Amino acid sequence: MKGRTIFKGKAKGEVLMTSEDISFYGGCDPETGVIVEKGHELEGKSVSGKILVFPTGKGSTVGSYVLYALSKAGKAPLAIINESTDPVVAVGCIISEIPAVDQVDIEKLKTGQKVEIDAADGVISIAN
């Protein structure tokens, strides 16, 4: 799969996928990486150490700093893949140095899959 580079870098890991948008501010605990938004498909699951796949971000611009706090706490996702990366998630990935790609058909990815991402080239490979 090929997408557009948001922030370069490489990562290899397990997909955590949702069809719902994510608000990092108020929706994700910056100390634990657990999604805390009530009723969210990923409520109670941790983004830490995962290839986080979701359509786009939502909510406050403070979400960029929540991604940064996750990074500083060692609880950030390994990489982010979106259909369309919003400015809040883009800035969060850049300041936190989280590899990120968008313009991807995320329906081809499923929770638990192993993937490799080379965000500099926008390439996502599904491991066998």
Q: Where are the regions a protein language model picked out?
A:
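Feature captures the catalytic cores and cofactor-binding loops of soluble hydro-lyases/lyases
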Residues: 3-11, 16-125
